[in-house]
From Swiss-Prot:
It is found in: Nucleus; Chromosome; Chromosome, Centromere. The gene is MIS18A. This is Protein Mis18-alpha. It comes from Bos taurus. Keywords: Cell cycle, Cell division, Centromere, Chromosome, Isopeptide bond, Metal-binding, Mitosis, Nucleus, Phosphoprotein, Ubl conjugation, Zinc. Residues 82-180 form the Mis18 domain. The modification Phosphoserine is found at S37, S40, S41, S235. Belongs to the mis18 family.
Amino acid sequence: MAGAWSSDCCEGCSSTNCTCGHKSKWGDSSLLGRRLSEDSSRHQLLQKWASMWSSVSGDASAACPERKRREEAAEPAEEDRPLVFLCSSCRRPLGDSLSWVASQEDTNCILLRCVTCNVSVNEEQILSKRKNENGCILETLYCTGCSLNLGYLYRCTPKDLDYKRDLFCLSVGAIESYVLGSSERQIVSEDKELFNLESRVEIEKSLKQMEDVLKALQTKLWEVESKLSFTSCKS
């Protein structure tokens, strides 16, 4: 894949914000927030991503005043920040929620319009064996760093599944998420580092050593001065 990001056409995609004008049964963002199975960790993770994305991709009329309030706030709420999807094995970034199209609850996958260059595509095409995907031709997606199987790219689909064509289907089990801007740790420069008990003890120890050295030098200086004065008196 060329460049830092690879982008594919979302022809027939189901995103409610897509400019192509096509919609499908599951395109409504409200469907992304449906309650999923509580006993499945993958379903819970998918639900979390879907609900976070739904909170920032609602109707434009309702989003305008909320967007104004977010712009005025110094720190955006965590649920309003974009998600970065990482390889679960080597933690390389694979994509983000800004290219989100939809989630597939039955297959535990998310559909993205584009991914990063860390996702490689095996151009060997295979027929999908998934339920209700008869006639779909797929290309396998791998992580360029660790070769982990990430999912599939839909290259050819029957008419009723056209919304999946040229979309990247990433398996929830192969990826992890990171909320952009959620890190709290800051690097403190050496000149601004706060004193603690250990550093105070070390400083006091160094000062004591310097004091001992100065006293020794002062004693040597007195000895030299005494010898010089004694020599001058004899002469």
